[in-house]
């Protein structure tokens, strides 16, 4: 891998971390409590897990320097759902809450957009 590619990937990761932090801050302003960030299991990962009242949201952050409105693939959605299932097994006290799978879109110099209930698990 060339130095230029490595540097571009490093910048993209940094932009993604900043975008996730901005999204977490916006969610707090909207009354959510952040339960976890970067929850990872072999089955998948979730960027942000947040709770507001009886709602537990599993949030995927998509950060792009250009238009961020890229749709999640079915494979990506399945990995997020599997990670959510693994998370729920570790936190049985949250079992009675309503679940939401959300998407937050972040573009350069734009306020993050929160798409609540962006998709439903395929069952």
Where are these regions (language model features)?
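Hydrophobic "anchor" residues on beta-strands that sit immediately upstream
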Residues: 33, 56, 98
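Residues forming the ATP-binding cleft of Hanks-type serine/threonine protein kinase domains
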Residues: 39, 62, 118
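Short acidic/glycine-enriched loop/turn segments that link adjacent beta-strands
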Residues: 42-45, 109
């Amino acid at each position: 891998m060339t130095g230029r590619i490595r540097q571009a990937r490093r910048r993209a990761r940094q932009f993604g971390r900043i975008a996730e932090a901005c999204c977490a801050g916006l969610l707090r302003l909207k009354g959510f409590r952040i339960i976890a960030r970067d929850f990872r299991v072999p089955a998948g990962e979730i960027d942000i897990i947040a709770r507001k009242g009886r709602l537990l949201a599993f949030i995927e952050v998509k950060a792009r320097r250009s238009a961020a409105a890229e749709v999640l693939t079915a494979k990506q959605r399945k990995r997020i759902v599997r990670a959510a299932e693994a998370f729920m097994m570790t936190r049985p006290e949250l079992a009675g809450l309503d679940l939401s799978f959300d998407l937050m879109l972040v573009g350069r110099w734009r306020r993050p957009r929160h798409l609540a209930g962006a998709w439903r698990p395929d069952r």
